[in-house]
Amino acid sequence: MEDSHKSNTSETAPQSGSTVQAAHISHIAQQVSSLSESEESQDSSDSIGSSQKTHGILARRPSYRKILKDLSSEDIRGRKGDGENPGVSAVTSMSVPTPIYQTSTGQYIAIAPNGALQLASPGTDGVQGLQTLTMTNSGSTQQGTTILQYAQTSDGQQILVPSNQVVVQTASGDMQTYQIRTTPSATSLPQTVVMTSPVTLTSQTSKTDDPQLKREIRLMKNREAARECRRKKKEYVKCLENRVAVLENQNKTLIEELKTLKDLYSNKSV
């Protein structure tokens, strides 16, 4: 009886141990599965959150079509504002009276608003010989610069005068210059005409007939010719010196050759 009881107890002991191990293994498997499920759920929640964040960023970022639409609407509004307020950029035009001046010789000078000068001489039937001169406005140029313009005389000759001077030819044939002074401010008008001392302008033909000028021109030409002659002489002398040096070298070589020939002849004769 005792032996049978011992065998029964020995059989039941390994069975109970195996059941405990199986329960422990199942518990560990449940924990591992729960951990993997929690990790998967966390990964899925993280991916969902990141996708939601990127979607929100893209939703907040304006599209190119919206940007172009905003720019076009701003341009249209700016154009409408310019059209509604044309007086802001428009320049108001006002009529300016034309000043007329009379010189001591009886000649009339009228200055138009556009800068043109009108010259006229008095006659028996009123103003005669109206002549218009267009002057260059030098208000925007730098100080110290002089602008020249052509002025045509009665005989058809053209002369160069500064842009702030007017040349007037009188009835006697003399030519007088008038200086125009313009104020630097842009609002004031150039209405002042100051008469300077009369300057007699002679033609080019009268200048060439001057004997003093002819003499100076002749002396200048003579000086240039003498300078050129001296230069050619120096070049010729230098060329001759080079030739002499070459001939001296040739003479030395010939003397040396003659000496060698004499030595050879004397040796052969002995």
UniProtKB/Swiss-Prot annotation:
One of its GO terms (cellular component) is ATF4-CREB1 transcription factor complex. Gene3D superfamilies: 1.20.5.170. The keyword Transcription applies. This protein binds the cAMP response element (CRE) (consensus: 5'-GTGACGT[AC][AG]-3'), a sequence present in many viral and cellular promoters. Mediates PKA-induced stimulation of CRE-reporter genes. Represses the expression of FTH1 and other antioxidant detoxification genes. Triggers cell proliferation and transformation. This is Cyclic AMP-dependent transcription factor ATF-1. GO terms for biological process: regulation of transcription by RNA polymerase II. Residues 9-21 have a biased composition (Polar residues). Residues 240-261 are annotated as: Leucine-zipper. There is a cross-link at K207, K214 (Glycyl lysine isopeptide (Lys-Gly) (interchain with G-Cter in SUMO2)). InterPro entries: bZIP, bZIP_sf, CREB1-like_pKID, Leuzip_CREB. Phosphorylated at Ser-197 by HIPK2 in response to genotoxic stress. This phosphorylation promotes transcription repression of FTH1 and other antioxidant detoxification genes. The CDK3-mediated phosphorylation at Ser-63 promotes its transactivation and transcriptional activities. Phosphorylated at Ser-63 by RPS6KA4 and RPS6KA5 in response to mitogenic or stress stimuli. It is found in: Nucleus. Disulfide bonds: none annotated. Its main location: nucleus.
